[in-house]
Amino acid sequence: MDVTAKYELIGLMAYPIRHSLSPEMQNKALEKAGLPFTYMAFEVDNDSFPGAIEGLKALKMRGTGVSMPNKQLACEYVDELTPAAKLVGAINTIVNDDGYLRGYNTDGTGHIRAIKESGFDIKGKTMVLLGAGGASTAIGAQGAIEGLKEIKLFNRRDEFFDKALAFAQRVNENTDCVVTDTDLADQQAFAEALASADILTNGTKVGMKPFENESLVNDISLLHPGLLVTECVYNPHMTKLLQQAQQAGCKTIDGYGMLLWQGAEQFTLWTGKDFPLEYVKQVMGFGA
């Protein structure tokens, strides 16, 4: 790719950042489409995020992706949020229109699209959702919008717990989906929830390198063959949770699906063009 002064810059702001496949994926897509943009990753944490946003405006960047730990904080630094992003309380995409920043969340649409592409109909189904950060809440919100009957959130009683309760209340008030939030330490409640669930989704970073030997499911017998197990983590490709699920006879969807579909939507938001989906699947080796 020959980058010239006519190229516009798109970023990714996250910490840590080196594990991300987004720069490779987006740059391959941009080059294939022949578009005058380049995508770069920037190591940005909560403390440096405000300054990074000022830099985005000053450099007239087209926009940026936002990942952990900045997804919720980023809502405070945009001029407009989509209705879905308001429901989530977190964004993963910022589009810069001449200094006016719009915030979107494509995590939820990406993950639900990956589930649908597998042939699974979520309408009327029950999901057990692990975590209450930006990815989890995005998936929960989009799932509720698209027809999930019930979402059972399980997360540790940490700094996200009160935010999870507030998220559950927003979804309950604005959709027909029933959302509950339970401390993950309550393993009896967790076991009972899994027994009647249709989908188990890991929206946490548990299982991501260098913690690839970890899983929030401590007992593989809690997983049953009728359960669809989906993952947000894609590094490693086969997380411990997915290994457990396959051993238990569950159908699984890896983190590449969410990465691909959320990235496709981001691409269109930034460029106004269609994402070269089949090409990217081939060159990135996603295969699904």
Curated annotation (Swiss-Prot):
Binding of substrate, residues: K71, D107
SUPFAM superfamilies: Aminoacid dehydrogenase-like, N-terminal domain, NAD(P)-binding Rossmann-fold domains
Record-level Gene Ontology MF annotations: quinate 3-dehydrogenase (NAD+) activity; quinate 3-dehydrogenase (NADP+) activity; shikimate 3-dehydrogenase (NAD+) activity; shikimate 3-dehydrogenase (NADP+) activity
EC number: 1.1.1.282
Pathway in which the depicted protein is active: Metabolic intermediate biosynthesis; chorismate biosynthesis; chorismate from D-erythrose 4-phosphate and phosphoenolpyruvate: step 4/7
Single Gene Ontology BP annotation: amino acid biosynthetic process
One Pfam family named in its UniProt record: SDH_C
Binding site for NAD(+): A132, G133, G134, A135, N155, R156, R157, D158, K205, C232, V233, Y234, N235, G255
Keyword Amino-acid biosynthesis tagged: yes
Keywords: Amino-acid biosynthesis, Aromatic amino acid biosynthesis, NAD, NADP, Oxidoreductase
CDD domains: NAD_bind_Shikimate_DH (cd01065)
Catalytic activities: L-quinate + NAD(+) = 3-dehydroquinate + NADH + H(+); L-quinate + NADP(+) = 3-dehydroquinate + NADPH + H(+); shikimate + NADP(+) = 3-dehydroshikimate + NADPH + H(+); shikimate + NAD(+) = 3-dehydroshikimate + NADH + H(+)
Function (record text): The actual biological function of YdiB remains unclear, nor is it known whether 3-dehydroshikimate or quinate represents the natural substrate. Catalyzes the reversible NAD-dependent reduction of both 3-dehydroshikimate (DHSA) and 3-dehydroquinate to yield shikimate (SA) and quinate, respectively. It can use both NAD or NADP for catalysis, however it has higher catalytic efficiency with NAD.
Family classification: Belongs to the shikimate dehydrogenase family.
Complex formation: Homodimer.
Protein name: Quinate/shikimate dehydrogenase
Organism annotation: Shigella flexneri
